[in-house]
Amino acid sequence: MTTAEDVAGNPYISDPRTDFESVEDVDAETAREQADQLREALRYHDYRYYVENDPVIGDRAYDALFSRLQRLESAFNLDTDGSPTQRVGGEPLDELPDVEHVARMGSIDQGGEEADVREFDSRVRNGLDGDVQYFCEPKFDGLSVEIVYEDGVYQRAATRGDGEVGEDVTENVRTISSVPQRLRGDYPDFLAVRGEVYIPRDAFTTFNRERVERGEDPFANPRNAAAGTLRQLDPSVTAERPLSIFFFGVLDASVDFESHSELHERFPEWGLRVCDRTAVVDDIDAAIDYRNEQQQARDDLDYEIDGVVIKVDDMDACDDLGSTARAPRWAFAYKFPARKEETTVRDIVVQVGRTGRLTPVALMDPVEVGGVTVSRASLHNPSLIADLGVDVGDRVRIKRAGDVIPDVVEVLDDDGDGHFEFPETCPACDSPVEHDGPMAFCTGGLTCPAQRERSVEHYASRDALDIEGVGEKAVQQLLDAGLVSDPADLYDLTVEDLTGLEGWGETSARNLVDGMDSAREPPLADFLVALGIPEVGTVTARNLAQEFGTFEAILDAADEGDTDAFEAVPDVGQTVARSIVEFFEGEGNRAVIDRLLDHVEPQAAEETDGDALDGQTFVFTGSLDGYTRGEAQELVERNDGSATSSVSGNTDYLVLGDNPGQRKQDDAAAHDVETLTEDEFEELLDDAGVL
């Protein structure tokens, strides 16, 4: 534990005097010495408050020390990296750029039944010799981030994103008081850590109340508030919100650790805040007991948890177990059951999704479920309404499935006097409703304004054409301003159109327009995904592109109603084939497609031998000019190669784009892996007959 003796002689540690002389009366040497002492003292007080939870001075004294340091640094130009004052919000950004993670931020296998966790334990013990100890910790319900320190100084932070690339939130995370700007003690030269950003419950309640008093909409739950705050473009907004963090893992470091429990002990020595509700247990029975104890305590905690994470404690054993393509074999998230509460249904409304699916939603008396006030719950489809027998005025039990989306699960009292009837026409466009099994769909296609709105967002999404700057908020702005009504309108946008909207700068506007220009010749498979054809995902779209070759051939088969031609495609059955034909038969859909074809020319799928890369393994780092990372990986995999996220002894090539990750280059050197520039990568593909 750090003590005041560690900073002996510093006058600002215990009961500090705050009646400073005027800055104008201080000479440069004295100012520099006093600023150094203040930085040291403020780091110490941050440590005592956030890590030790044992402050030695009050808030007023801390604020006085902080303010004095700010004035000294400003008056004498003494700003330094790692100063506590650097966490105050910086300049607003036009966008949050993407950044590649030091190491993959993978997900964890999870389950909510005891049988699930016992199966995990069985797999672990079958893969290891001897006894197994587990390190157990709460599963925080916040937003996971990567934070990088070099030589003990805070350098960078990023959201998890897709696990390989996240959003750069360096300046926003810098404002979080519990994130040290400089590490303490005998820290490693390089440290990339994983933490969970959250808003404490009490702070969330106060924060939401203040928003309502200002006439602003409250956040639905602490997690949404934390996520929205962390993605603010203006760090000064983030600085005013009550974010906190728990650190719980290492992604990469210049030192080794023998166990997860050792890691948990070392973090506080470096000033990194950890949760104190952890345990090392000798068997899975004790881990299950730990989980049950945390479930009992969850409502008394000042932070949201939705389960516990059980990890093999020994790091060497973790290495022996390894990982699957998506998750480590040495960890398991044992989830809590969904919370349930009672309330009364006041109305039932029907929402329209991107594919035209109609989803009934119950509007209810507000009820608190696990610290979150909810007033809406999904009823999923007309069949569920009939099965439950739910109606307006009924007393019902709801649960938060996965602690996120509320569902109505039971009618307790059906004495309500309402009588809900599922509509026969779409509430957004009055088109006839068609029933398919338990589900109901609007038949209006892209003539339906609700479907158009979702289709615009989907068209530009990462899974489709991956166009920068076209997210849910931007789409709503564009629709409200009358600038777009369907995906084709995106291609007509100008920088002048966009800079006239609130929150849009020259850079973000130019990025969107340039992104649309670069999407005028999309790969056929990506274009098919972007159209949002029901039942057609990435794999099916790729198979359709390979089988038909051109978009015109797909249109011809659809125009002829040739479901047999579609069923001949791998993974396409009767239901999917019929869905494809019906999509292209829709008049509204064809009108939008015809407009799109005025702007785009989908590129025919390249025919390849299929095994041109013959099992070679590629890793990509940095930004490529000619491909997105997904396109490059898909190109490799289509030709019998393998694309992985990390360099190992099995890697054949590391392909370097712009701003490549240094860690992957170091790993390539350690494993004697050949590196390629993008031009060399394309030469290799050309020699193999791929291009």
From Swiss-Prot:
Provide this UniProt record's keywords sorted from A to Z.
DNA damage, DNA repair, DNA replication, Ligase, Magnesium, Manganese, Metal-binding, NAD, Zinc
**Pfam families, sorted:** BRCT, DNA_ligase_aden, DNA_ligase_OB, HHH_2, HHH_5
Catalytic reactions on record: NAD(+) + (deoxyribonucleotide)n-3'-hydroxyl + 5'-phospho-(deoxyribonucleotide)m = (deoxyribonucleotide)n+m + AMP + beta-nicotinamide D-nucleotide
Q: Which residues form the active site?
A: K139 (n6-amp-lysine intermediate)
Residue ranges constituting the BRCT domain according to the UniProt record: 608-691
Entry's Gene3D superfamilies?
A: 5' to 3' exonuclease, C-terminal subdomain, 6.20.10.30, BRCT domain, DNA ligase/mRNA capping enzyme, Helix hairpin bin, Nucleic acid-binding proteins
What is this protein's function per UniProt?
DNA ligase that catalyzes the formation of phosphodiester linkages between 5'-phosphoryl and 3'-hydroxyl groups in double-stranded DNA using NAD as a coenzyme and as the energy source for the reaction. It is essential for DNA replication and repair of damaged DNA.
The family classification in the record reads: Belongs to the NAD-dependent DNA ligase family. LigA subfamily.
User: What name appears for this protein in its UniProt entry?
Assistant: DNA ligase
The gene for this chain is: ligA
